Swiss-Prot record:
Subunit structure: Component of the WMM complex, a N6-methyltransferase complex composed of a catalytic subcomplex, named MAC, and of an associated subcomplex, named MACOM. The MAC subcomplex is composed of Ime4/Mettl3 and Mettl14. The MACOM subcomplex is composed of fl(2)d, Flacc/Xio, Hakai, vir, and, in some cases of nito. Interacts with shg/DE-cadherin.
Alphabetical keyword list: Cell membrane, Cytoplasm, Cytoplasmic vesicle, Developmental protein, Membrane, Metal-binding, Nucleus, Transferase, Ubl conjugation pathway, Zinc, Zinc-finger
Gene from which the chain derives: Hakai
The keyword Membrane belongs to this UniProt entry's keyword annotation: yes
Positions with biased composition (Gly residues): 420-429
Native source species: Drosophila melanogaster (Fruit fly)
Entry EC number(s): 2.3.2.27
Molecular functions (GO terms): cadherin binding; ubiquitin protein ligase activity; ubiquitin-protein transferase activity; zinc ion binding
Gene Ontology biological process terms from the UniProt entry: actin filament organization; chitin-based cuticle development; dorsal closure; epithelial cell migration, open tracheal system; epithelium development; female sex determination; head involution; midgut development
Reactions catalysed: S-ubiquitinyl-[E2 ubiquitin-conjugating enzyme]-L-cysteine + [acceptor protein]-L-lysine = [E2 ubiquitin-conjugating enzyme]-L-cysteine + N(6)-ubiquitinyl-[acceptor protein]-L-lysine
Biased composition (Polar residues): 464-473
Name this protein carries in UniProt: E3 ubiquitin-protein ligase Hakai
Pfam families: zf_Hakai
Amino acid composition bias (Basic residues), ranges on this chain: 9-30
Amino acid sequence: MDTEEVKRGRGRGRGTRARGRGRGRGRGRGKKIDDSSIADAAALAASSCAALEDSPGRLDASEDSVMQELDKDGELETPGALEEPLPHGALGAVAASGNMTPATQQPQVLQQVPPPVMSQTTISLSLARAVDMEADISQLEAPTFTTLSRGPPEPMLRLKWNHKVSLIGEKVLNPMIHCCDQCDKPILVYGRMIPCKHVFCLKCARAEPIKSCPRCTDKVLRVEQSGLGTVFMCTHGGSRYGSSGCRRTYLSQRDLQAHINHRHVAPQPPPLQPQPQLSAMAEQPKMTDLGGVGLGLELHKQRKLSESSVPISVSASIASRPVLSRLPLTGGVGNIGSIGSIPPPGSAAAAQNAIHGGHSTLTLANLTRINNANAQECHQGKASLHHTLKKGTPHQSESVADASYYSSVLASFGSAAGNPGSGPPGGGATAAAQPANPSGSHSAVGPGALIGGSTDAPTGGSSGNWQQSQYYR
């Protein structure tokens, strides 16, 4: 019997202890045991210890079963349960069951389970106390490091943010400290008088309704508030840190510099040299313009000089020039139709030709040829007049028109010499001027038209044709 009980007490398939549990669980892999399973295991261990006191093998079997069923919490409390004295009824039942057969042992064990439940109340209370002590420690969270924002920490939440703040200063980059003229204290907030722009501290500026500025006694319209470091003061006439001088204030360095340039910098007198240069530049276009008033006066003076330098007979012929100069203008085309048709300078037709550039194709070489031919035909006075005209600055359109006009006048002198109506004085004058001809190469025109005064109109026409060929050569 003992050997059979020993065999039944060992192994995995023990009948009484395999109840409510699957097979195949190894040592140390048991399920978590609740309070009822711990009480059942304690009762079974107590009964086995009492029934098998004489057999050491059964004690080993009971210890193995306790090791399998209980975890660390159960192992700490199980020795206390084993040491407790069992009731007398339980001892008697265990002693009586020792003489019974194994077949009737299982119902007896089931009957013996309820009495030890009364003693398990102390075990459950002690276990509850132990769990409560450890629960306080298990509720503490281990420190974890994460990038998730968990909000402000607890010490920051305990802070109060509704404190009253009193600012005692303001951070300004290198401020210039000025003192108030009324209270002699450094100015932290400026009271700026408008429009005189003098400053005091804001308290003194608004202390009473000020009608005038205490510094300059000007009328004050309003007081403007400005912060420290925003005011730029003019120190002209005084020191930087003193209270004398201009002491006007501006809100930017640019405005302050404009005030200094306007109020305190003396305006420099304009230089005297550019004025004569400007006057010379203004007079230069007048000199270059042949139709201008200045050149007209100069030409008039030159004509007076040339008239005074010629003989009396020549001056008489020159005096008749205004009468003869009207012939090409009033008498149609005639002898000099191609050249005399050019209007005199200053007239409306000449201005129109100058605008349209009708005679711009003539070159300076042709102009000099015409002047040389006229100088050879005319007397010394006329040649000197042409030389004075050539000294002027050649302006293309007007100079050509001017030279052609005087060439037509010279041609009219030649035709008037051959006209019988001109009288002996005109013929005598031209005959007297004949020795002044430097060369006789143009004798076909000169002697036939000038000597004797008996040449008729075709001779004058031939001279006009010759001038026309010289003009367009």
